[in-house]
Amino acid sequence: MATIVDPRDIILAPVISEKSYALLDDNVYTFVVHPDSNKTQIKIAIEKIFAVKVASVNTANRQGKRKRTRTGYGKRKSTKRAIVTLAPGSKPIDLFGAPA
């Protein structure tokens, strides 16, 4: 990804797990991101989409698992995750929507 066309092309989805949910109290959020994106692009995309200030971005490449099917073996897609820490004093990101 040479240039950012749309920030929503970089941030694909939030990661919903026990571990990522526990980190929400510390203003740390986890997202599935485009595999070719870098930390700078992820930071700019988060700041544009959610209007927050990002302190740091850590990334992790997750290798796709080999899975057995009826006809042999297949492979799940490899993914990239970004662990985003918000700056102190920044408003929290509302991932799940406020109750009506």
From Swiss-Prot:
Disulfide bonds: none
GO CC, alphabetical: ribonucleoprotein complex; ribosome
Any one Gene Ontology molecular-function term assigned to this protein's record: structural constituent of ribosome
BP GO terms, sorted: translation
Keyword Metal-binding assigned: no
Function comment: One of the early assembly proteins it binds 23S rRNA. One of the proteins that surrounds the polypeptide exit tunnel on the outside of the ribosome. Forms the main docking site for trigger factor binding to the ribosome.
Family: Belongs to the universal ribosomal protein uL23 family.
Protein name (record): Large ribosomal subunit protein uL23
Species whose genome carries this gene: Mycobacterium marinum (strain ATCC BAA-535 / M)
Annotated gene: rplW
